């Protein structure tokens, strides 16, 4: 499979999760936008991705609706794993004409922080850290050399920012600033933009 344009990174530590992505939207060497937000809060979850931007937007909308529907229907909140599995099923349903995207999905519930990686046909893998998109090979080296599950969220945010910056330096389809989403183990959410 060809690398999907963009870089998105997720990191799980004992204190919570951090997801980040750069903002460049490019197709075939042409920069279409420098303001493409690829990290989203969906209910009490975070989602980031690389790939066709319209597919990422559609998946975000679908997940917003499906999570709300589940919670209204059952009268209880959906767990992180169940929400990630729901996304996996949605992706698999479209396997003949897949969403051209790689997704990072995470959140915090009674089982603690969780991070999942999904490919275009719905493979679901739980991991401590992951990078997707065309800048992933660069970013993953930074993460592997410095990741520690015991680091606090501030250090985790610095590490993920360092990894995205490394990708921006070497990947032509990544750039134009960094969106950072942080969720602590109590479910508190913080969103930051870092110009770069």
UniProtKB/Swiss-Prot annotation:
Q: Any idea where this protein resides? A: Cytoplasm
Q: What is its EC number?
A: 3.4.25.1
Q: Which UniProt keywords apply?
A: Autocatalytic cleavage, Cytoplasm, Hydrolase, Protease, Proteasome, Threonine protease, Zymogen
The protein, known as? Proteasome subunit beta 2
What Gene Ontology terms describe what this protein does at the molecular function level?
threonine-type endopeptidase activity
Organism equals Saccharolobus islandicus (strain L.S.2.15 / Lassen #1) (Sulfolobus islandicus)
Query: Which residues are in coiled coils?
Result: none
Q: Sorted alphabetically, which InterPro entries does this protein's record hold?
A: Ntn_hydrolases_N, Pept_T1A_Psome_bsu_arc, Pept_T1A_subB, Proteasome_bsu_CS, Proteasome_sua/b, Proteasome_suB-type
